[in-house]
């Protein structure tokens, strides 16, 4: 049902992946989506679906923007079939294409036609009319590559900061991070949030959580105490509390759920 596709080489610095969610489902089925430090444009190709809080119904042939999410969200199907495609931008990727203050879109989903950024309704309709995912990816590639010559460079310190945080699995103290970058912490935090939508601490927290989900999926009876320490948490209770807050489930329930091997960030409850 869920598949991921890498971007072309020219767009790899900006796009984390393309993804497609397609298949038969059940009415009112819940899909939990975990925070990943990225932002998405989602094209709804067939039947409607709706976030659990009911803030909007995602209609076919429309597109939506999902801002930087700090905790899990839930999507509820409103049909027996689900088909959508997403363009997932890397933490600093969207800032190169659109000078929008991502800090104002944290934990939000909006009808993307209201933003007037990158895509429009005509583009979304044309994309959804195509028969195959490969055609859709080709159209998006061509659309974004045409904009590469006009891109404004993203602050290299912030790009470097996100790279360092990811390399450290979210366990690099912010003071050490700013020391490595030779930048004042307050100024750094403002720039980081403007470009990524997160504070450095929030982004580190999500990166650590993502690392913990990968480790947890590979566990086979290992000691939870050691797991918590290896993933940068004080103790098992701290780990369980953080995991529950970001995923909506304790680690034990997460391990028991049917999670697709290629998608640790989306699962059915």
Language model features with spans:
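Alpha-helical bundle regulatory/interaction domains
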Residues: 1-169, 173-175, 180-185, 199, ...
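Contiguous, well-ordered alpha-helical segments that form the cores/surfaces of helical PPI scaffolds
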Residues: 163, 210-214, 241
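Extended amphipathic alpha-helical scaffolding segments in membrane-proximal extra-membrane regions
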Residues: 173, 191-192
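Catalytic-pocket segment enriched in acidic/His residues
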Residues: 186, 190, 198, 202-218, ...
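A secondary-structure capping/hinge motif
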Residues: 195-198, 242-253
């Amino acid at each position: 049902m869920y598949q991921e596709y890498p971007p072309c080489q020219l767009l790899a610095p900006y796009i984390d992946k393309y993804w497609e969610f397609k298949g038969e489902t059940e009415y009112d089925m819940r899909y939990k989506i975990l925070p990943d430090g990225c932002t998405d444009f989602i094209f709804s190709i067939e039947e409607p679906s709706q976030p659990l809080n009911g803030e909007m119904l995602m209609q076919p042939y429309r597109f939506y923007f999902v801002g930087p999410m700090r905790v899990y969200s839930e999507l509820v199907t409103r049909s027996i079939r689900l088909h959508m495609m997403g363009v997932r931008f890397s933490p600093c990727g969207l800032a190169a294409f659109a000078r929008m203050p991502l800090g104002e879109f944290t934990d939000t989903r909006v009808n993307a036609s209201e933003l007037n950024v990158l895509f429009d309704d005509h583009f979304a309709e044309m994309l959804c009319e195509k028969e195959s995912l490969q055609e859709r990816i080709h159209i998006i590639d061509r659309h974004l590559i045409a904009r590469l010559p006009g891109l404004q460079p993203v602050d290299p310190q912030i790009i470097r900061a996100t790279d360092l945080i990811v390399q450290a699995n979210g366990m690099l103290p912010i003071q050490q991070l700013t020391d490595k970058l030779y930048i004042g912490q307050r100024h750094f935090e403002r720039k980081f949030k403007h470009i990524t939508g997160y504070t450095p601490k929030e982004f580190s927290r999500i990166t650590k959580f993502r690392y913990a989900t990968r480790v947890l999926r590979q566990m086979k009876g290992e000691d939870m105490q050691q797991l918590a320490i290896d993933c940068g948490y004080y103790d098992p209770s701290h780990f369980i509390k953080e995991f529950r807050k970001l995923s909506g489930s304790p680690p034990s329930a997460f391990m028991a759920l049917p999670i697709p091997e290629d998608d640790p960030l989306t699962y059915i409850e």
